């Protein structure tokens, strides 16, 4: 096999493009709010907690799509018709799990 050697300007250009793309991804993520000092006023603390709550809501928000499938399965099992109950696994009531 013959190794193809790229000239160094092409390699540098590829690295710069990669860094620019990574920089765009980092800017898309929300920044965590900075905590006020220990001698902060109640208004500053209130603003900080509001911005922290907003940040946590953004970071931990629900994402809909393929990950939503187990919830659909759970709702199907929870709200089944009587005709579908024959397909559910049978569990004897006399046996304790402990």
Curated annotation (Swiss-Prot):
Point out the propeptide residues: 68-98
Which residues are the signal sequence here?
A: 1-28
The lineage's top-level taxon is Eukaryota
The family database entries (InterPro entries) matched by this protein are listed as:
Pancreatic_hormone-like, Pancreatic_hormone-like_CS
Is Mitochondrion among the key words of this record? no
Q: Which UniProt keywords apply?
A: Amidation, Cleavage on pair of basic residues, Hormone, Phosphoprotein, Secreted, Signal
Q: At what positions is Phosphoserine found?
A: 41
Q: Where in the cell is it found?
A: Secreted
One annotated Gene Ontology cellular component of this protein: extracellular space
Indicate the principal place this protein occupies in or around the cell.
secreted
Q: Set out the biological process GO terms recorded for this chain's protein.
A: eating behavior
Mind telling me which Pfam families this protein's record contains? Hormone_3
| Entry keyword Repeat | no
MF (Gene Ontology): neuropeptide hormone activity
Family label: Belongs to the NPY family.
Q: What does this protein do?
A: This gut peptide inhibits exocrine pancreatic secretion, has a vasoconstrictory action and inhibitis jejunal and colonic mobility.
Q: Quote the protein name from its UniProt record.
A: Peptide YY
Name its species: Mus musculus (Mouse)
